[in-house]
Regions:
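Alpha-helical structural signal
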Residues: 24, 43, 64, 97-98, ...
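Short glycine/serine/threonine-enriched helix-capping/active-site loop
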Residues: 37-40, 78
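Alpha-helix capping/helix-boundary segments
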Residues: 9, 41-42, 82, 101, ...
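Generic structural signal for small/hydrophobic residues in well-ordered secondary structure
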Residues: 7-8, 45, 86, 105
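Active-site neighborhoods of divalent-metal-dependent phosphate/nucleic-acid chemistry enzymes
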Residues: 55-61, 69-115, 127
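Short, conserved active-site loop motifs that form the nucleotide-linked donor/cofactor pocket
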Residues: 33, 73, 124
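Residue-level signal for well-ordered alpha-helical positions
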Residues: 16-17, 48, 89, 125
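Short, well-structured N-terminal submotif of metal-dependent ribonuclease cores
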Residues: 1-37, 51-66, 108, 117-121
């Protein structure tokens, strides 16, 4: 199954695995799943690390390269279609990175691995 992993779930999987639910852990680690990673997540993490708002277990580039390699993550780029879709989303969620990830999940018709209950307002299948 194809699915998208959100930023927090990725951080927890790599650095604080014990915070994941069994459902989320299985979704992330099941080799039968194709796990997509939004370019929005890559950018969000870089910004937060650069602003010293987030500390990772390795330097950013090493951390990201290792996460992508270890999980076999498939990068999902930002496209005009995704950007356009997020313009029509209700304002339940204000974070621009999360709004783009929501739009990507909706356009692709895939579940999202996330602890964020606000996502339930968007009709996304949330795995947690």
């Amino acid at each position: 199954m194809r699915m998208l992993i959100d930023t927090q779930a990725l951080i927890w999987y790599v650095d604080q695995d014990h915070l994941l639910t069994p459902v989320a852990h299985t979704a992330i680690t099941d080799p039968a799943n194709d796990l997509l990673l939004s370019a929005a997540t890559v950018w969000e993490l870089a910004i937060k690390v650069g602003q010293r708002k987030l500390s990772l277990s390795l330097p950013y580039r090493q951390w990201m390269d290792k996460a992508i390699a270890d999980l076999g993550l498939i990068l999902l780029p930002v496209t005009i279609e995704y950007a356009d879709r997020q313009t029509a989303l209700p304002a339940h969620h204000k974070d621009p990175f999360d709004r783009l990830i929501i739009a990507q999940a909706l356009v692709e018709g895939i579940p999202l691995v996330s602890s964020d209950e606000k996502l339930d307002f968007y009709g996304i299948q949330r795995l947690w």
